[in-house]
Amino acid sequence: MKFLLLSTFIFLYSSLALARDKHYFIGITEAVWDYASGTEEKKLISVDTEQSNFYLQNGPDRIGRKYKKALYFEYTDGTFSKTIDKPAWLGFLGPVIKAEVEDKVYVHLKNLASRIYTFHAHGVTYTKEYEGAVYPDNTTDFQRADDKVLPGQQYVYVLHANEPSPGEGDSNCVTRIYHSHVDAPKDIASGLIGPLILCKKGSLYKEKEKNIDQEFVLMFSVVDENLSWYLEDNIKTFCSEPEKVDKDNEDFQESNRMYSINGYTFGSLPGLSMCAADRVKWYLFGMGNEVDVHSAFFHGQALTSRNYQTDIINLFPATLIDAYMVAQNPGVWMLSCQNLNHLKAGLQAFFQVRDCNKPSPEDNIQDRHVRHYYIAAEEVIWNYAPSGTDIFTGENLTALESDSRVFFEQGATRIGGSYKKMAYREYTDGSFTNRKQRGPDEEHLGILGPVIWAEVGDTIKVTFHNKGQHPLSIQPMGVSFTAENEGTYYGPPGRSSQQAASHVAPKETFTYEWTVPKEMGPTYADPVCLSKMYYSGVDPTKDIFTGLIGPMKICKKGSLLADGRQKDVDKEFYLFPTVFDENESLLLDDNIRMFTTAPDQVDKEDEDFQESNKMHSMNGFMYGNQPGLNMCLGESIVWYLFSAGNEADVHGIYFSGNTYLSKGERRDTANLFPHKSLTLLMNPDTKGTFDVECLTTDHYTGGMKQKYTVNQCQRQFEDFTVYLGERTYYVAAVEVEWDYSPSRAWEKELHHLQEQNVSNVFLDKEEFFIGSKYKKVVYRQFTDSSFREQVKRRAEDEHLGILGPPIHANVGDKVKVVFKNMATRPYSIHAHGVKTESSTVVPTLPGEVRTYTWQIPERSGAGREDSACIPWAYYSTVDRVKDLYSGLIGPLIVCRKSYVKVFSPKKKMEFFLLFLVFDENESWYLDDNIKTYSEHPEKVNKDNEEFLESNKMHAINGKMFGNLQGLTMHVKDEVNWYVMGMGNEIDLHTVHFHGHSFQYKHRGVYSSDVFDLFPGTYQTLEMFPQTPGTWLLHCHVTDHVHAGMATTYTVLPVEQETKSG
């Protein structure tokens, strides 16, 4: 250990001789925080007083808006007697810590609170004794002192700002964070979190970034006060009858979740003010739990982030991102989270753009076009599946035992598959008498409004006529407008009159005028056209779910034909995947009256009734009923994707049979979140009928899946790829007993170090739970076609865990997988990204052997700006959901031709990580597992919520709580981490590496120590380990941390050649 430390010190001090020393004196203090200090009347979006009172009003069993918290404060010096004022907008966040590359930062921490806390920094380099995180890491004595700073004690943390943060493609200064890490989720919920800004060498002048006028740091978080260490104190202090409080009551718990920005909720965040034409830098991060799916929307502004144009920034727990904006359009604007549940719960703030007579950037565009649209909102009867059939199974949608029955069955208290909705429809002129007929190319649009398109420099005029029964509007994204033309109504105190633009009454008409200045258009890195959307913003939640949404595309100057189609593109498709929540529709009561046979018996609060109205659709179509997704072999296709909704709307839209290019990367699955939009470029090279579907398991079974067809048309299309290399793998599906947690030692030591005594619902058997062992089926490699001898996994493969064998291929190869089904039910093997002869994956019956052939053309390999090797997943598709959760998944790695020989004389270390909550309730073997492993199988109720929860195994490669072994490397190794995400709505995983940053490529090289994973995300992360030690690797989502989605990786000093393991 002494040798290990000595080598670490020599390395750090030799490389940092030129460092600048910076000192911060930070105290942890307990204080009462008010989440909504400004109580003046504001007009917020989708919020009524009843909703705000639910969170802000205290009472007999309600805490209200004030909570005792522990917060980081900055002091002038080591006496800790005088605090330094911070900007009002920082809220309860700790002080901003700033460093340039090569700086050395000393954080003098004093704990003035009543319990142990620490200081753990993201994105910087530190040795083990400055990590500030509690977990079993084989350290002793002085290396443990950083793990717990007791009340009244002090500790100095020494941090080094090193390459690779920020990365070459990053902005000059990037967002990082620091927080306490005894029990990180509880410490953060108690208030201990702050921003750390890391900058490239020479980019700061007097502690401000050069060429930036204003900077702001924003944390979007649903702060869960139920997890705070001070919950008991807060109940005693702020509830008028504390003895009546039931801490397990769902309403009580929800009232303590504060939907806030920097600790301010319901529009009370102060101090966001700037001049028009100011160059503004936003440092943004998310924090929290599965509910923390945020879409930060800067109304009226254009931002660039990672060189792409945007007005929405998606944030998840520990997502770290920055954005640049030139403030425009003087006025008071809304900064909101467009997750519709968060909008209703008060996650909104105002920012002011003042007119300070600063010269604004010149817009020197000649010959402006005015594009005029005539759009009405009108009622329609909408059928989510006009054929009455599940196109995937051929069955009637109401067939017994079918997944679709719950949504399409009509009856006494069920609406069925048809709903009265509102839709935007286009007319020829302002008389609104002749509706424009949709052509065959527009058939796929479905419920969506007409496409509004424009080029940079254009003016858009939309004459909107409301034929409905409620006030409605049109709120665009991706264009510039004045406050008088905004379709969302909100306002600071004192602005009370309803504006015409944001409140078009029934039978009224309003003409909107929007412009497309240069900064709203695509950047050099963007595609030719940007996918955007428009929707009704009177009450976005109700209006969007009623059907009022449509696509927009904003394109580079001169890129469109007269009819709006993009030059050099054969076909354009618009896809809007969302869970239409008809319970939130403006017309719910009409639908109950019209379509149920006993409307007076309907209980709108009944969970089953609500579930039956959640329509998992694309453009308003379910189970393959979307028409018009037809194209020709070899055509140039653009897909414009966009979404809206809430935290359930985490989508992985998978195009089987083909890949696309987006942001320089080659992919086949696009991740979408509320209000996010994407442009995908595809050249289909295989004819047949393929699936476009959401990989999020509940969405897939719920009907969010369609078919697209690639035809051989007149145009001759030849695939000239010559597949020279041939690789054969012998893989079998084998049933095994799988133990998610063979040793409880790491978990027990963790809880001992945290001084917590916690039971474990996932691993403890108790009376009738299954425990940690389950029968599963896994892919395993064999030596030859006799399938007699399984390939023994080497030390470097130990970390694979449940994963099948890594299948490696280069572009131009043909991979033959000889697959034997040694299990007891039919399975198959199907890979993402590859080309196959047929669009059908044939199941292999028990005992059978079948050969699956995968071709690896150019479009299966890395894009121009990708890493040289990129991961895809392979899995069984007989029943996508049950096969996956039963255990069948593995990695496929595709490298550029001859990459290894040319680029890398030194072999890279490779590690494969699958972050997945294995839902054992969905496994084929659930009944077997109850029989075999439950102490009292006869007592098991498979619908019991606690039983269901106990079978959700939060695992990395199928292992929990430090049980994933074999992640061992040396200083100076080059390491590729191939990370994969699959699963359901809860499978948003923010993967955090302690001790090291990594690099990844998105049209440029970026650096971070947290990467966001979703169902269908496959990504290469490159790491160059430099600090020896055993380091934590975990998901940063609160529930996932507590449920055991964590392990460690070990970096050995360069001289110490020992066996890994």
Swiss-Prot record:
O2 binds at residues 120, 179, 992, 994, 1036. Na(+) 2 binds at residues 407, 416, 419, 612. It comes from the Eukaryota. Its main location: secreted. Na(+) 3 binds at residues 762, 771, 774, 950. Cu(2+) 1 binds at residues 120, 992. Binds 6 Cu(2+) cations per monomer. It catalyses: 4 Fe(2+) + O2 + 4 H(+) = 4 Fe(3+) + 2 H2O; 4 Cu(+) + O2 + 4 H(+) = 4 Cu(2+) + 2 H2O; a hydroperoxide + 2 glutathione = an alcohol + glutathione disulfide + H2O; 4 nitric oxide + O2 + 2 H2O = 4 nitrite + 4 H(+). GO terms for cellular component: extracellular space. It is an enzyme of class 1 (oxidoreductase). Cu(2+) 5 binds at residues 651, 694, 699, 704. Found in a complex with MPO and LTF; interacts directly with MPO and LTF, which allows Fe(3+) incorporation into LTF, activation of CP ferroxidase activity and protection of CP antioxidant properties by MPO. Multifunctional blue, copper-binding (6-7 atoms per molecule) glycoprotein. It has ferroxidase activity oxidizing Fe(2+) to Fe(3+) without releasing radical oxygen species. It is involved in iron transport across the cell membrane. Copper ions provide a large number of enzymatic activites. Oxidizes highly toxic ferrous ions to the ferric state for further incorporation onto apo-transferrins, catalyzes Cu(+) oxidation and promotes the oxidation of biogenic amines such as norepinephrin and serotonin. This is Ceruloplasmin. It comes from Mus musculus. The gene is Cp.
